[in-house]
Amino acid sequence: MPNKTLTVDQVIEQLQATAPRITELTAGLTPVQLRLPSDGEWSANDVLAHLRACADVWGSCIVSIIKGAPALRAVNPLTWIEKTDYRSLDFTRSLRTFGRQRAELLDVLRLAARGDWLLTVTVTGAGAPLKRDALFYGRWMAGHERAHLKQIAKMASALETS
């Protein structure tokens, strides 16, 4: 569940920091290391692929809400990733694309009126219909990415010392 205390500015700040932080954390890793999963964990490439799928799904929700959509159909990022080639892509190329897509999302978010973040939609397709706003999805995405940044940091540290 999302951190309910993050403000719009904090959400934007955290979303803006994700791609540069991944770049920083993985700078010393080789292409082989980026694809090397640790025990029972994903590789850095797997985490990036997952973050891209989540950003596709939740970023789309945010933009749709801000643009006034009355309803959304829920999409599970774990299902969405199966329709992509994200896991097979070169890490550096994929991260560069993620950074460009994030910049495009941030452009929309920065131009949105504060009230647009609180517009609600009905989300169907995941059980009982839910009422959600753009801030909910922004908080969810920011918190989710933060957890995976910690995962990448731990992974990179272990790989650099091995």
Regions found by a protein language model. Name each.
Residues 18, 81-119:
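Acidic/histidine-rich alpha-helical segments that form the ligand environment
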